[in-house]
Amino acid sequence: MKSLSEIDTTSKRASRASGFSWGIAEEVGKNIRLLELFGLPGIKNLTQYYLDRKSKKYENLKIINQKNISNTLAFCPIIAGVSFLDQSKKIENYTKLIFENLAYPILFLPFLSRSSEIMGKKISLSFDENEFLLNLNVNILVNKNDNQILPLAKKLEVKILENEDSFNDEEWKNLYALSEETFVEETDSLKQSGAGAGLTDND
């Protein structure tokens, strides 16, 4: 089994050989390491994308808008991802973004995962029948993982999610009430045994 360090280094070198700057190659190395760590097919998709680049051209998306459409060449997922990451603070003000004709969308994922951490917000991404939830670069939840090479997303939707509790007010009140049961009235016997001390008791 290849180590994450090997995956990072080899992906970085392959990226440089494919024509990207060392700076972008460094980002790709981190990204493929992240994908493989989360059990997603980073190596497969990166390898096939770089093989395709030998005979195909891709459009570089430098400015991220709410609608990003290419009617000719497919967008390069790496340049689009770098642009998304660099513009994270602007993008967090959007609620939804559309990308049409994006090549190898799996390679776009880790850029959004890292952007999620910068924004402090979860990001959802969907295309075809694939759905991903990017959780502050801590994990990536997937509705299915066929370990496949996905060469193109004709229409990809990104949503910036507002932070919300996963519980309602009533559930919180019930838990808080349970937590208060730890504070029992002190008696002489409890004092002697050390029980019943409050949270501010430093003895």
Which sequence ranges carry the predicted segments?
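Glycine-centered secondary-structure boundary/capping sites
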Residues: 1, 19-20, 39, 120, ...
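Long hydrophobic alpha-helices with heptad-repeat/coiled-coil character
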Residues: 1, 90-94, 104-115, 183-202
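Long alpha-helical, hydrophobic tracts
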Residues: 1-66
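Aromatic-enriched hydrophobic runs in primary sequence
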Residues: 4, 26, 32, 81-88, ...
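A sequence-composition feature that detects small, non-aromatic residues
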Residues: 14-17, 25, 74, 80, ...
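A glycine-rich, acidic short-motif signal
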Residues: 43, 48-139
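Extended, charged low-complexity segments
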Residues: 143-203
